[in-house]
């Protein structure tokens, strides 16, 4: 859902967005992203479940270039840090993307569930070992009780938090402002 919310934000800013459903391992991941693409009104590139995720990423970038899209957002599997082959897939996806856009990806956003506590730390650790994570989005921060995860992970891995998810609505993905976030602990 984070990707759908990002697509909505970028589209509101006037950008042409293409989504890529490269999480071909998780049941219903492709369908979920298609629902978001329809809701937001952006195109989506997908293949059947079990397809090669790198192939989906490649097709997504080829389509984005052909459509003169400003932004391609590719959803990948691997949220479960213990799936080593999924982590290796990220390296392959990057390599294949660079065949279309030599300096791709321009950003690697790791989406973490803020309600998972220590598991989020382990997930961040595994992802930073597998790929160059440039920023974080931390979801399920509807209350400040889970806020320590944001600060701890960003500090430990020296990765800036770019977005926080504070609800299920399409506008509930917010740009992270550290001073506002800290103030929310005291107000």
Question: Where are the model-predicted features located?
Answer:
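P-loop/Walker A NTP-binding module and the surrounding RecA-like catalytic core of P-loop NTPases
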Residues: 1-187
């Amino acid at each position: 859902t984070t990707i759908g919310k990002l697509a909505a934000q970028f589209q509101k800013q006037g950008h042409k967005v293409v989504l890529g459903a490269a999480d071909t391992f998780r049941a219903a991941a492709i369908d979920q992203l298609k629902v978001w693409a329809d809701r937001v009104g952006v195109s989506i590139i997908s293949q059947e479940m079990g397809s090669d995720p790198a192939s989906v990423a490649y097709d997504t970038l080829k389509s984005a270039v052909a459509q003169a899209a400003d932004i391609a957002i590719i959803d990948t599997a691997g949220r479960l840090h213990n799936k080593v082959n999924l982590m290796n897939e990220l390296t392959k996806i990057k390599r294949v993307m660079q065949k279309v856009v030599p300096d791709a990806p321009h950003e690697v956003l790791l989406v973490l569930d803020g309600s998972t506590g220590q598991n989020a730390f382990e997930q961040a650790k595994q992802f930073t070992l597998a790929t160059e994570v440039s920023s974080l989005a931390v979801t399920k921060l509807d209350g400040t009780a889970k806020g320590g995860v944001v600060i701890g992970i960003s500090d430990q891995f020296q990765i800036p938090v770019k977005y926080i998810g504070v609800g299920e609505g399409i506008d509930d993905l917010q740009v992270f402002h550290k001073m506002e976030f800290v103030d929310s602990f005291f107000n």
